[in-house]
Amino acid sequence: MQRPLPEGQIKKRDVNLTMKRMKKRVLTAALLLAFAVTATFASAGDTETPKPSLPAIKIDGNITLTGKMDDPLWLQAMPVELTWEIMPGENVPAKQKTLAWMLYNDDYLYFAFRCYDSVPSAIRANLSDRDKMFGDDFVVVSIDTYNNYQKGLEFAVNPYGIQGDLIMMGSGNEDPSYDMVWASAATLDDEGWTAEMAIPFSVFSFNSADIQDWTITLCRSMPRDSRYLLSCPMHDRNNPSWLGQ
């Protein structure tokens, strides 16, 4: 069984150059579920509705991962709700409430999910090896650092904090052989479950632009009588590109 690593045990790599580039940058994250979208904003002359987005808030210090979101630094984060069911229903209101948060510092991207469930006994969770938890309930973060819909890295956690990570291509094909060192924690309770992640910037490659525009997707998967995917915003099933939604 893989045990989630405490954040303090993550081995830091030589990321001096990366951190110098990141210190004065603002990460803009488009927060949705299951399929990546472009993190863009409508200009004054645009007539299209801008896609949902959320500023990435920088913090001082490191978050202690407990799976309970009890570190005071989380109070600085802005929540987003995954309001739509995109599978099996097509853009219908989500039947369960899910909130997500994101923060960052010079070393890590932090994510948290609060997954409410009206029937907590239906939550599926197993203690398993890495990458063997995708049959459970899980939350997943997909990150496309170049915002070009070609490739994204995915980081998933089940209600026991068991990790899964892989590479997703724009076509939807996945490579589960991808394994990196990052931290996670999760807990179950009477109202559902909560998960936290700390992903070091050292696992990513990205361009040298002063302003970074990344696509960051947040997903909740719920296997019940069917597998339910909950999303914020709607998903276009006519778009063949998984990352180019």
Residues of each region from the PLM?
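Short intrinsically disordered, low-complexity coil segments enriched in acidic
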Residues: 1-5, 27, 206
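N-terminal amphipathic/basic-hydrophobic helices that include classical n-h-c signal peptides
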Residues: 1-18
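Bacterial N-terminal signal peptides that target proteins for export
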Residues: 17-30
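Bacterial N-terminal signal peptides
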Residues: 29-39
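Structural preference for beta-rich elements and adjacent junctions enriched in aromatics
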Residues: 42-245
